[in-house]
Amino acid sequence: MEQTYVMVKPDGVQRGLVGEVISRIEKRGLKIVALRMNVIAEATAKEHYGEHAARPFFPSLIEFITSGPSVSMVVAGKDAIKVMRAINGATNPVDAAPGTIRGDFALDVGRNVVHASDSPEAAAREIAIHFKDSEIANYSRVDEVCLYE
């Protein structure tokens, strides 16, 4: 099973959307194998978003991500990265389809509720930033036999 990193950003937590996000993940057949709520440290945020360090929005992004609690998850399942990005919708809420998390709940590209890894390499890097291997559970959902061939 493929794994991906997912974060409910501070705006999603503050708006009470954590349960909605988790529900959509699980209803789609993915499973949450690690979960934590915390205020992400500035150094961790800078490591996570390091590829954007030269961009003009980087300081405000770091300020936002560290402004309050977020929920970090490792999500697993068949094609978890692609499926999770489809659940989230386009990064810019204006372009996000109705029925996606961002299409239904996001208001602004800078406050777009959720983050999910965009590639296997990014997923591995982001998971390692936020979780130790010992914090990731290995279990089977009882409905996996119905979900996958």
Swiss-Prot record:
GO terms for molecular function: ATP binding; metal ion binding; nucleoside diphosphate kinase activity. Its cofactor is Mg(2+). Its EC number is 2.7.4.6. The keyword ATP-binding applies. SMART domains: NDK. It catalyses: a 2'-deoxyribonucleoside 5'-diphosphate + ATP = a 2'-deoxyribonucleoside 5'-triphosphate + ADP; a ribonucleoside 5'-diphosphate + ATP = a ribonucleoside 5'-triphosphate + ADP. The keyword Transferase applies. It comes from the Archaea. Keywords: ATP-binding, Cytoplasm, Kinase, Magnesium, Metal-binding, Nucleotide metabolism, Nucleotide-binding, Phosphoprotein, Transferase. Its main location: cytoplasm. PANTHER family: NUCLEOSIDE DIPHOSPHATE KINASE (PTHR11349). Major role in the synthesis of nucleoside triphosphates other than ATP. The ATP gamma phosphate is transferred to the NDP beta phosphate via a ping-pong mechanism, using a phosphorylated active-site intermediate. NCBIfam families: PRK00668.1. This is Nucleoside diphosphate kinase. It comes from Methanosarcina mazei (strain ATCC BAA-159 / DSM 3647 / Goe1 / Go1 / JCM 11833 / OCM 88) (Methanosarcina frisia). The gene is ndk.
